[in-house]
Amino acid sequence: MTENYRGCYEYLSAQYPEVGGYEFYKELFPDNENSGERHTDFSHPNAVYLYRDEQSEDKKLRRRKMYNDTWEHDYMEFVEGNSLTLCSGLAYRRKENRLENAQRMYALIFDLDGVGLAELRNLFLRFGGDPERVRRLPMPTFLVLSGTGLHVYYVFQQPIDLYPNIKIQLKSLKYDLTFRMWEYGSTSQVKAIQYQSINQGFRMVGSLNDKHGTELVAFRTGERVTLDYLNAYAKPENRVDVNKPFSPSKMTRAEAREAYPEWYERVVVNGEKGRKKWDIAGKVHGDDPYALYHWWLRQIGEIKGGHRYFFLMCL
């Protein structure tokens, strides 16, 4: 047992109720099929998890659907005490837990490594604060001790249907909140931020982290959330709009030339496929002589741990 794990367990167990693994996943995925049911219209997607087959010689990872009526037995047989089990916050069509098969999101989950008692306390100073303030974070539904840090669960009041455009938007939202959450020297002891897919699998509650010999333990820290609640903590361009239609542009080349003449000249005529460079001289000698300074001010929420003094120097 690491010092980080021990300190975080003592802190959380003194303030929040512990939730067992069986109950945790029953609450997370209340709509799983019963064994033997077959819905060909994809109306009942299931959670899918991976577990290490301790009986096989090669200790191979095997995939299994999470069924409602057999979950108690399956949890004790395949998850509890297992050295490696993985499950995401999504439900899938068919048995493969691939992103293209993902149909609903029940929870948005974050992996935060390098969390000790000091980092955990800093997180709680930020959880539930004013979303307009820098680095404030939504209050999670559950915190899970992973052995090396925390798994942060935001469980939705209603699952999110994963249309292709919604998957893309949720990825942007997760990346935005990951940046807010992971701050070296404050909320994590690890410098490099780890950005993960919305389809990422996480070690399951009640299983063991075989690298550290610790059990994954969950604590209920808050309520279920809505997309609007999470959106409030992200930049406007990274928020999820479930009503936003996904349709490719039907604009013709002639219409694009008329509507976006500068872009057309640069990309179509001149073949410049790279990103447009910022014309600093043109900005400074244009309407805003302090354009560069104002640009740096807008980056205040993007500064990574270890670079704050450089940011202040630029100002």
Write out the residue ranges for each language-model feature.
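Catalytic "initiation/cleavage/transfer" segments centered on a nucleophilic residue
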Residues: 70-71, 185-269
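DNA replication initiation on ssDNA origins
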Residues: 1-107, 117-122, 129-134
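Anionic group-transfer/hydrolysis microenvironments
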Residues: 113
